[in-house]
Amino acid sequence: DLKIKNLTIVGESIGAVLAACVSVQAPKQIKKIFMFNPYDYDSYFGEGVQRGNFFAKFILFHVGLPIVGNLFAALENKFILKNIMSGGFFDSTKLPNDYLDLLCTSLNKKGYVYHFRSVLSQFNKKNGVKALYKKVKVPLKLIYGSHDWAKESNKLETKDLLNADAYETINNSGHFSFLENTKEVRDIIKS
């Protein structure tokens, strides 16, 4: 039996989807969840990330290919990561270099390529998360960046499945609002 009570869970992107999943598994422990830019709409490998820019589309298309995709994924480096991630920002100058350095520490670890490709290939709208959304019973706030990768139809579908009254929008923000609009995110969580 969990001793944790009145927990607030905040997640962005895949983390937002995980917040919803945890709330279904442990509703008595969860007071509220905040879902920022939930990444729940892919119909093919890395679709959402590919919406960011041409560079991301080119790289992820090739990473998603059978067999040769492993080679493309193994070539990932700071330059590639930065150019893919910049497609998730309204203002790409807000992508911190030290954060990129931190992410790059994983690139050469054993199993990285396998796990990276596995997450993007399994994380799609057919993985059951949409059905799980209907089971979320805890209070929640759904928030999107004004320039998130999700299309309006994706946002409305998620809102409806979660039975949310509405979703909030952070202006001048892409998919990575935690990094790009820290103050606005903080204010939403504190509200």
Residue map of PLM features:
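Acidic catalytic loop of the alpha/beta-hydrolase fold
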Residues: 146-151
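Catalytic histidine-centered segment of alpha/beta-hydrolase-like enzymes
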Residues: 173-186
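Conserved acidic catalytic loop of the alpha/beta-hydrolase fold
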Residues: 1-7
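Gly/Ala-rich beta-loop-alpha elbow adjacent to hydrolase catalytic centers
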Residues: 11, 15, 19
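Flexible "cap/lid" loop of the alpha/beta hydrolase fold
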Residues: 24, 32-67
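Conserved alpha/beta-hydrolase catalytic His-Asp/Glu region
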Residues: 45-48, 70-134
